């Protein structure tokens, strides 16, 4: 029931599927845009900062340096609008998008992200949002319709009938303009398929089939021509107008695309330079003192200004400070002084700094040079010689530490709260929605009277207080900034509160509502749907298993013609049997290596699909095993039948096949585990070959168990080749009362070596006679039944599959550390 309630509330968002219906909320959304956004509504982010530790060489010594990729970014994105994130290369656009989407590991991201005034957990963000990656990770052998149907099957609950899912898929195809490509394969380098623009729209479609409340897109126009790029953004605009919150990164949008954007966020070195409407950027730059020249594009001109300041001694601080509080910089700062060129032989000594100061005064034509302390620049923090990336270094760890210990937290951008200075009621409302320091749990925002636990924050009714305030609130992003905002009524820098990550986590635990099931479908249904897709891929990629079947068939024929008749009972045939069986096991092992590149290519699709709870990792592991089992059975049976009949083996055919079948299952599980751990198929091949060599060396063929040094004997017991090799020998020689005869000289050289008679050997046997048990005793095989070997082999296969699941579940996550 909880899931159905959540699905019902998502429908109230007037998403893409319902935006065209009469009586929808398009008019209401337009009214909201005219009434402006309010705190406690939409997606709010406060003081987002993210840093990493980088090793840098300074004065010949490697040191750890904290580098900020995001620094103190605050703002809001509301329903029905597109927020485009822009900036120069390395500005932190994708990092910022990942921070909002919950793709940064816990403990690394500072600040808070809220939806409708409620703090969000990573699991909740996955349930209400979708993320379209920059690379289109799709199965090339599926058609567009099949790709959408799979997304509908795993993203929509079973309460929705299959006919309804098909109807929704066709509606989505029409909305995205993919009607003509409905039954076209996605395609790849080897098979022609949809175009680049259509492929991008398919990637967007599979992420919105379940009508998410938030949609994140990383460079959706990358690699597309201008017409295709405009078409993609136009469809994204339709999605936003359906009631979703859309945030996307974009690089150098055309003028037509800029006209489709509702709000832009421009970053540089992880710092916020501008957030607001595109048509207000001209006023923003004029207020800063850098009006846009006639004929210039506003965004491109701002990027040029950013580059100019970034390469100057003053840095980006004037731009950041003006965006933060509307403080117009000193006139000297509006003409940035270029940095002197760096050379390997020149350091920033005090004398050189003095010379730079003199040059700066001359460059500004008599204008007083601003004090470096005005923008937080210290002489001791000039590390430009070592800073070779486009990220922001922490200016002063001690300063931030003093802020925390004093209880004064960094305030929000004035654009976000400047309108709350008019009345004490507004101040109280702001503190009540965003949060005040040290409030008892009973006064947390989640326990305000307007919160209804049965509905998600995005679709539930807003609180009574928020509705009262919405009529008088004015969007700070749409208002021209003035210099009289700060200090009119009170200083919010000492009272505004940005909850720390630890407090944010505690609030989540206390106030998280019942979100219903984490996944849309039960486990068995996920297995069935994933198995259906895997079968389609296997059928349309016959070379994957056909090549392995051909290899095993050809090698079975070759081995049969090389070893000829192995049914004779001479000493020479004993060594020939041992050689044949060890080669058969190794052949089966190496035939599974083709799973390395196939899974590595599929792994990126798995990460994309599971990053927002499309299905469970366990469903994926089990479904792939179910589909592959019949192919393993056929391959093992083919090899067993050919060699059994042509070589006249005395072994039991069913047991022979079962051992090969179990070997294929286990080796495939092992190769899948390796491919899940390595970054590329080249590394995967290297690891598989190296471990196979160790397994081969310690399986008991070259060195018997008693001949292996004690400190390496553990390798003998974990060898994946040991158990099938022993099982095949037991199947051939166990309970074989026939007598192998010949000269002892025929036993050496060979793998058998010196004979060690078994307990079944007695004096009544002929002089030069060896029983099958004698062969097993000589090979140090003490297992009483081959089924023990089969069970142990399958147990290793289960263990490999379990480790494979753990890697997929906990290691294969698309998040920053």
Swiss-Prot record:
> Which ranges does the record mark as transmembrane?
543-563, 580-600, 622-642, 658-678, 682-702, 788-808
Q: Phenotype when inactivated?
A: Stunted arbuscule phenotype due to an impaired arbuscule development during arbuscular mycorrhizal (AM) symbiosis with Glomus versiforme; normal initial phases of the symbiosis, including hyphopodia formation and fungal entry into the cortex, as well as normal arbuscule development initiation, including arbuscule-associated genes expression, but strongly delayed and impaired arbuscule development. Normal nodulation in the presence of Sinorhizobium meliloti.
- Give the first-level EC class, as a single word: translocase
- Please give the residue ranges for the topological domain Extracellular: 564-579, 643-657, 703-787
Q: Which residues form the ABC transporter domain?
A: 43-294
Query: Region labeled Disordered — which residues?
Result: 1-30, 321-349, 362-395, 439-463
Tissue specificity, per the record, is: Expressed constitutively in the vascular tissue of roots.
Origin: domain of life:
Eukaryota
Biased composition regions of type Polar residues, renumbered to the chain: 362-375
Q: Which ranges form a coiled coil?
A: none
Its induction note reads: Accumulates in roots cortical cells containing arbuscules, in a RAM1-dependent manner, upon arbuscular mycorrhizal (AM) symbiosis with Glomus versiforme. Triggered by RAM1.
Q: How does it sit in the membrane?
A: Multi-pass membrane protein
- List the GO biological process terms: arbuscular mycorrhizal association; response to symbiotic fungus; transmembrane transport
- In its UniProt entry, what is this protein called? ABC transporter G family member STR
